[in-house]
A protein has these predicted regions:
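N-terminal, Lys/Arg-enriched amphipathic/low-complexity engagement segments
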Residues: 1-46
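Short, well-structured beta-strand-loop connectors
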Residues: 48-61, 80
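Conserved hydrophobic positions within beta-strands
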Residues: 76-78
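Flanking helices and flexible, charged tails adjoining ferredoxin-like Fe-S electron-transfer domains
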Residues: 100-126, 131, 136, 149, ...
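Gly-rich Lys/Arg/Thr-decorated short loops/hinges at beta-loop-alpha junctions or inter-strand turns
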Residues: 105-106, 134, 157-171, 292
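Histidine-anchored nucleotide/phosphate-binding helix
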Residues: 176-191
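Hydrophobic alpha-helical positions that pack around
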Residues: 195-307, 313-318, 328
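Ferredoxin-type iron-sulfur electron-transfer modules in oxidoreductases and energy-metabolism complexes
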Residues: 346-362, 372, 376-439
Length: 439
């Protein structure tokens, strides 16, 4: 198996919660369940104010081909359907459910099911009905990903267990606490692709996970565990495909175009739960960490739980946070309020003290080339920044600015402290909007 690697950086891991076993967080009195927890069209509400709903009930139906169902995480009463703020600041239609404390589930939830008796289309339908999306942060509807144009061209199914983002440990805890779900979910996916082999890719700074998964798959002829070098952004889709297969994927391609299906460990475990245990997506494992947090921890959380309640479950703040990030410091989203709900793509809440947050004034580029040397997309950030400063979309496209994966490596390494990644995010949005206008 190939062991190639794209350009990368070494970052401090800060995996302080790696040894913290996942705890089930107390269920809140109210959950706020967004209709837009995925890439694509928002889901359409299927309930009305005053309705009683059950845990496991579909309360939002996919609003298009690229969309996903939304499942209620508690039983109770719909108190409102109204716009609520999400992590990215957008006001999104949401269903507010008052938890009745009975935790009554839809009939059939939790029942065992033998996946070997299911057809490929039945498996895909179950995944769709369960509301499963890419849980590593992308949020792409999983049933769509599992339906490539040519399923016979898929020869790799890669389980992404790299978790290269600093501070995050939720995937690691799942690897060592629930490996049977990951292996079981991978076996289900392999039923869909007759020519594929399964690879569980884990960075080599997680030896316990590698050992445990290797032992679990020793008698599985189509599944192997692939230890990866510990680099950032090793968990990026393009990076992990190249590391495992030696194949390159650009922005105009899907992983399926390179014969690969890539799913995060939580996504694969959720497929197992949906197909083998008749349990739709109702929960997430979330890391709450950072020096401002009294008791950093990994929590098993009901979707729709408020971030503020997550903080309280971790003992609150031991010191006033200077910055709070949904996710990790490299690719996470800074928050101006914690009055937002946990959604399908949530992975962590990282709370920094003032001492942890460095504020620098950017200075002039010294053309050192460090940003070029670490870019996994092999593009030239220094030239892209010039185009971004001039709002020159044409040049930005010509120099392959749309190949940027927004990993933050260039910003991290820049001695002039220039906000490269932020500028590229804005330019990519502008270029994409211009393309849509042109049709």
């Amino acid at each position: 198996m190939s062991q190639k690697h794209l350009h990368s950086i070494h970052v401090s891991h800060y995996k302080h919660t790696a040894g913290c076993a996942t705890e089930v967080m107390p269920v809140p009195d109210v959950v706020k369940i967004s209709m837009s927890q995925h890439i694509g069209a928002p889901a359409k509400p299927l309930v009305a104010k005053g309705d009683r709903v059950l845990a496991g009930q579909k309360i939002g139906e996919a609003g298009g081909f690229i969309s996903a169902n939304v499942i209620c995480s508690v039983s109770g009463t719909v108190k409102a359907i109204e716009p609520r703020r999400m992590v990215n600041g957008a006001m999104v239609p949401s269903i507010i459910v008052e938890n009745d404390g009975e935790y009554e589930t839809v009939e059939g939830v939790g029942e065992d099911r033998d996946p070997s008796t299911l057809s490929k289309e039945e498996i895909r339908s179950i995944v769709k009905e369960a509301g499963i999306v890419g849980l590593g942060g992308a949020g792409f509807p999983t049933h769509v990903k599992l339906t490539p144009k040519d399923e016979n061209a898929i020869d790799y199914v890669i389980v992404n267990g790299a978790e290269c983002e600093p501070y995050l440990t939720s995937d690691y805890r799942m690897l060592i606490e629930e490996p049977e779900k990951i292996v079981g979910g991978l076996k289900v996916i392999l039923q869909l692709f007759d020519n594929a082999k399964g690879v569980i890719a884990i960075e080599n700074n997680k030896p316990e996970a590698i050992k445990k998964l290797t032992e679990m798959v020793k008698d599985e002829p189509k599944i192997t565990v692939c230890p990866l070098l510990t680099k950032y952004p090793q968990g990026g889709e393009r990076s992990i495909i190249y590391a495992v297969t030696g194949r390159k994927v650009n922005s105009s391609m899907l992983p399926a175009d390179a014969g690969c299906i890539v799913d995060n460990v939580d996504t694969v475990a959720s497929i197992y739960m949906a197909v083998c245990k008749s349990t739709p997506l109702m929960r997430k494992i979330i890391t709450i960490t950072g020096d401002a947090v009294a008791e950093p921890q990994n929590f098993n959380v009901k979707l729709g739980t408020n971030y503020q309640e997550l903080i309280e479950a971790a003992g609150g703040f031991k010191t006033e946070p200077e910055k709070i990030i949904s996710g990790g410091p490299m690719m996470g989203q800074a928050l101006f309020t914690v009055d937002v709900p946990v959604c399908k793509t949530s992975s962590a809440l990282t709370c920094f003290t003032k001492d942890q947050v460095a504020a620098f004034e950017p200075t002039a580029c010294i053309r050192c080339g460090r940003c070029v040397s670490v870019c996994p997309s092999h593009i030239v950030p220094v030239m892209m920044m010039k185009a971004a400063m001039n709002r020159d979309c044409e040049t930005f496209e010509k120099i392959n600015g749309m190949e940027c994966m927004e990993c933050g490596s260039c910003t991290y390494i820049c001695p002039a402290r220039r906000p490269l990644t932020q500028a590229f995010k804005e330019m990519r949005k502008t270029v994409a909007a211009n393309r849509r206008k042109k049709g």
